[in-house]
Amino acid sequence: MERYEVIKDIGSGNFGVAKLVRDVRTKELFAVKFIERGQKIDENVQREIMNHRSLRHPNIVRFKEVVLTPTHLAIVMEYAAGGELFERICSAGRFSEDEARFFFQQLISGVSYCHSMQICHRDLKLENTLLDGSIAPRLKICDFGYSKSSLLHSQPKSTVGTPAYIAPEVLARKEYDGKVADVWSCGVTLYVMLVGAYPFEDPDEPRNFRKTITRILSVQYMVPDYVRVSMECRHLLSRIFVANPEQRITIPEIKNHPWFLKNLPIEMTDEYQMSVQMNDINTPSQGLEEIMAIIQEARKPGDGSKFSGQIPGLGSMELDDVDTDDIDVEDSGDFVCAL
């Protein structure tokens, strides 16, 4: 890590801590996720690194490299100076339909690319969507800890993700198509941007996890009367929030939906993005063998020293062992800041 100087903490989570660093030579800023060596370097960490490394798209936080310190595995990635999309909604209360569409178009563009690379995210949520520092912010998907590649891993079965964003078929604990489940999570994100609340949580009992699950399974949601949403947008939501995954709208169909296509920036079109990707010859700085060797070494315990700090965006959990009849689990986070 001699190549980087730490500027400040930018948060902490279940994984460890995140810090803002500067490349001593180039003066470039990066975010670094520090994960304690030893038991915490599990298959999720390896999956996150391997999947993230393969993705190169303007709406995905770019992976740079992994570095081993005496105490931690450090994942170096692009720094998104604009913070979380979640924080922006908290400040605004909710977005206008045009602003929501602007960010949704970028979200779908990034997710579509992930799926084209045979990777489903499985934990799409506002806290995992960051913004760069520009005036018209570019959305950046991050956190691939729960992602699965159909090229490297089996079809998803485990119930992972954040309760408010989980698709009905994921709750059923059977094998499901992670790409189709991602569509549902994108719909939840769109709804939250428009309304400033989660679609399937009871506003009077936002922490009643059992009720949230019941509402998800029965697709029980509504757009409040005080929120002005066009019929085209309502139609798109109704096509996303479909319990049967085989009948749910797909990402390619979303990209052809009239509401999505309105005011679509040229850089969001498939043709433009294809040309950008063909011209992106900037290959990852590390080979697979080097990365795997670093991960293997990181599984050996370090000297045990710890960092401190706070990071937003908690709330993901493994739900395989949860009994939905006897649930005492916190929800994904109340919208105390909105409305």
From Swiss-Prot:
* Family annotation (Gene3D superfamilies): Phosphorylase Kinase, domain 1, Transferase(Phosphotransferase) domain 1
- Out of the domains of life, which is the source? Eukaryota
> Under which name does UniProt file this protein?
Serine/threonine-protein kinase SAPK2
What switches on expression, per the entry, is described as: By hyperosmotic stress in leaf blades and leaf sheaths, but not in roots. Induced by abscisic acid (ABA).
A GO CC term attached to the entry = nucleus
EC number(s): the record gives: 2.7.11.1
- Please describe the quaternary structure of this protein: Interacts with BZIP46. Interacts with ABI5 and PP2C30. Interacts with PP2C51.
Activity control, as annotated, is: Activated by phosphorylation in response to hyperosmotic stress within 5 minutes.
Q: Please name the GO terms of the biological process aspect recorded for this protein, alphabetically.
A: abscisic acid-activated signaling pathway; protein phosphorylation; seed germination; seedling development
* Tissues with expression: Expressed in leaf blades, leaf sheaths and roots. Expressed in shoots and roots of young seedlings.
Instruction: Give the binding site residues for ATP.
Output: 10-18, 33
Upper classification of the source organism reads: Eukaryota, Viridiplantae, Streptophyta, Embryophyta, Tracheophyta
Q: Where in the cell is it found?
A: Cytoplasm; Nucleus
Extract one GO molecular function annotation from the record.
protein serine/threonine kinase activity
Domain Protein kinase, by residue range, is: 4-260
One of this protein's Pfam families, by short name?
A: Pkinase
Q: Where is the active site?
A: 123 (proton acceptor)
* Xref: SMART domains: S_TKc
User: What exactly does this protein do?
Assistant: May play a role in signal transduction of hyperosmotic response. Can phosphorylate BZIP46 in vitro. Together with ABI5, PP2C30 and PYL5, is part of an abscisic acid (ABA) signaling unit that modulates seed germination and early seedling growth.
User: Where is it chiefly localized?
Assistant: cytoplasm
> Where does the record locate the signal sequence feature?
none
